[in-house]
Structure formats: C-alpha cells, structure tokens
Amino acid sequence: PFALSFDHLKKICDIILKRLPNVKIMTMASRVTNIKNKTIDQLKELRKMGITELHIGVESGDDWTLNRIQKGYESNEIIEQVKKLDEAGISYWLTFLNGVAGKKHSYNHAINTAKIFNQLNPIVVGTGGLTLFPDTELKKETELGEFDPLTEKEMLEELKIFLEKLECNARLITHHTIAINLSGNFLEPTLSS
C-alpha cells in the first residue's frame, strides 16, 4: 500500500521486479495523506519502477465533511497532493462516498466534491454508498440521533447532483453499495457535429 515510505516501497518494487521481471504495472490504494510524504522526484522514481496507478479514497471535497469523517486534510490539500501525481505521470482514480455527509450537508458534499474533482485529471471517478455497520461510531451516532443518514432515494438525489456538476474527463464506476449501477465513459465530453 502507498502508505509505506518511499524507501520501503522502493524495496518492495525491487523485490517484485527481481522475482517477476515482466511486471510492468502496479496499482495500489492510497489516501491523500500518503502522497504528502513523497516528493515529486520520488513519485517519478516509483512510476519508473512500475507504480502506474493509485486508487485514492478521497470520499469528499467538502471541508465540513472531511473534518466530520476525520480524513486528516482539507480540500485544498487534495488538489495540491493529487496534482503531484499528474506531474509524476501516475494515473489515478478518485472516490466519492455517497451519503457520508448525512442529510443536512448532502448538497454541499456533492457540489464541493465535484468542484474539487473538476480541478484534477482522474482516469476514473468511483462512487460508493455509505453503509452503516454495527458496532461503529457512525452507527452509534445514528442510533443517538446525532447523524441523520440519507435514504436510498436521497442518496440517488445526492449522486445526481454530484454527477450534474462533475465535468472532468473520466470514466465513472459505481460500487455495488449504490442502488443504481452505472459504468461508462459518459463523463467524457461529446463531440458536436
């Protein structure tokens, strides 16, 4: 995982390339904070070693929501860190977590996340739906009335707002946790005749 230090990742890549010399592509999960501890030169070196794509769990581009879910960064840092990947030649997916802001902040979550994503160059925008698991802090907050989760219909409305504002040239993939399965290149601009 990209959470490891540059030196540790480099050692792992060396081992992989020695044992499997035909490997050309390595993909891994990442957080925005995992990019922060790597310089552009280090990212370029990791790209040369075969780390070609990251799947970044952004979840939201809304500062209130990012703080609420304790991501450990603000929206401006998403842009700053992810643009380092563009410069290093590493492609990336960005994820939007549908429903994570709750009812009161749903609109801002959708709008502000689209605004952030529109400033970046993801190859894929992935969306997943919030699932409240037993024995989690968010489930307890829901039971105490401190968090008001979206209904399935409200989640689709939030997703619609997000997609209407999304203008980046990327493929869209929805996770099975969303009530509607969407996949395709329909975010790409259409050519007028």
Set out the residue ranges of the language-model regions.
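Core AdoMet radical
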Residues: 1-6, 20-37, 51-78, 123-126, ...
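Short, small-residue-enriched loops and turns at beta-alpha junctions
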Residues: 2-5, 32-36, 99-105, 133, ...
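Alpha-helix N-cap and loop-to-helix initiation/capping positions
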Residues: 4, 8, 41, 70-77, ...
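Mid-domain alpha/beta scaffold segments of enzyme catalytic cores
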Residues: 7-12, 16, 38
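Acidic (Asp/Glu)-rich catalytic clusters
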Residues: 13-21, 43-50, 83-87
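Conserved C-terminal portion of the radical SAM core fold
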Residues: 76-138, 152-176
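Short, glycine-/aromatic-enriched active-site segment of Class I SAM-dependent methyltransferases
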Residues: 138-146
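Radical SAM enzyme core and accessory elements
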Residues: 181-193
